[in-house]
């Protein structure tokens, strides 16, 4: 049976690649973007019968509710949800504007919460559905300058772990995708890097520069990640959390080893509370 996909951030990058993979697979897509005119090529290529473009800013809960409602009315069901929209700016904690910090959390975390909440009644009534949260390797590690973005991604992992337990009995599956570098514009023009203050040049400044230099040569290709999503979708028991990319596997493994070693080092003190 063909599936109906609801995808946020469908106009470019990973969201567009997943939308195209779903459509090439014979499915239909509720394609959302802040600027729906950017979805014109997708509609022209696959037809308005299978591509339903919807304006959506995921930080606006009322807009989320309306987008889900209109998409559901168009196709009669929603089978797959891809929470993909998000962005990162780079700044030291001491330097970052509080409004910028909150805006990143709103887009990267609350957008996931809003969309997940909006689709749950539909999926629960259907007794089926699969929600994919596009998180990041940054949901398992920390990098200087990405405090807002990575705080949100860590929270997406926690939120989704709880959500999976709440909805499993309804036939709803949850998968958190945790990619490393993806060959998109994430670290290019999409990312703002305010002036880094002198004390943080060696940490935040150096890391921001490394992101800029690597932009366009990241390991993972959006279309290949889209194929991974299709494969996971076909699994009877899909993973709750899935690292994506050789860099993600490497760095997450190293981070887990460091944490395990620290836990073991301080084990005796940890047990002293009883």
From Swiss-Prot:
One of its GO terms (molecular function) is oxidoreductase activity. It comes from the Eukaryota. Pfam families: adh_short (PF00106). Its EC number is 1.-.-.-. NADP(+) binds at residues 14, 32, 57, 84, 117, 149, 153, 182, 184. Pathway: Polyketide biosynthesis. Induction: Expression of the botcinic acid clusters genes BOA1-13 and BOA17 is coregulated by BCG1 during both in vitro and in planta growth. The active site is at residues 135, 149, 153. PANTHER family: SHORT CHAIN DEHYDROGENASE, SHORT-CHAIN DEHYDROGENASE_REDUCTASE FAMILY PROTEIN. Oxidoreductase; part of the gene cluster B that mediates the biosynthesis of botcinic acid and its botcinin derivatives, acetate-derived polyketides that contribute to virulence when combined with the sesquiterpene botrydial. Botcinic acid and its derivatives have been shown to induce chlorosis and necrosis during host plant infection, but also have antifungal activities. Two polyketide synthases, BOA6 and BOA9, are involved in the biosynthesis of botcinins. Belongs to the short-chain dehydrogenases/reductases (SDR) family. This is Oxidoreductase BOA17. The gene is BOA17.
